[in-house]
Structure formats: C-alpha cells, structure tokens
C-alpha cells in the first residue's frame, strides 16, 4: 500500500491536477477492492475453526458458570472461575479477529453443548462434580486438538496465531482438570 501511495504521488508530480485526481480515485477504488477481497478470502476451514472455537469457548463459560453455582468442591469452583476468565478473554480476542474478517460467530450454544448444559444442570453434589469434570476433560482434549490443528494447518495468519497462542492455555486447563479428577 505504501508503494501504491508513493506511485500515486509520483504520478501526481508528472501530470496535471485533474489527472492526479483521477489517479487518486482509481487508487482508492483499487485499495478498497483489495481490502474487500481480503476479507472475503478467508478459507472455509478457517471459518469452521473460528465457529468451533467460539462455540466451544461459549460452552465452557456456560458450563463453568453452572459449576460455580452448583459444585460443592472448592477446587472445581476455582477451576470453573478460571474457565470463565480464560475463555472470556480468548472469546473476546477471537471476536475481534472474526469481526475484522467478516466471520459471523455463533451467539448461542449448539444442540450438543446445550444438551450437556441441560443434563448437567439436573445433577447435584458428587454426581454434578464428576459429570462436570468428565465434560471438561473431553471438551478440553477436543479443544486442544482443534487449536493444534489450526496452528499447524490454518491458512489465515491471524487465526493461526490465535490458535498457537491459546493452545498452551488449553493444555494448562487439561493438566489442572486431570489433577482435580485424580484427587476425586
């Protein structure tokens, strides 16, 4: 873009004012077209990643809010609080990336995650804690694979970098929930 701007200014120096205005107008149109093409060029696999990551993160938040209310285990409540904080931060970052790329992220839980939330909400005590831990282990293992796959194979640089940055946090969550599981 800098070279394009320089070229437009160089052309302006060589031509009359009306020709320069035409060059400016053409350069602006070309730049706008390039920017629009850049947002439309996000690969479908990257869009699917963003959708899955956002949906999974949203589910972790909702499940963990429920755990903060219903669990009787302090370690689980602390883990759930960490989930809400970490997944909210990651979700906010992903939302900015998605907005810049015109990717529409889900605003509600998908059917699978909604069923998990509904089923979990019916449990209490030790049954609740065991079910929550089981879901966290399964979902985080899936999330780690999702992040690692995108970090290794993603085509969009921003989403690839996001996945690479989030993967170690997901691994830390796996380690923490497995430690809680081992102590139950």
Regions found by a protein language model. Give the residues of each.
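His/Met- and acidic-residue-enriched segments that coordinate or traffic transition-metal cofactors
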Residues: 1-184
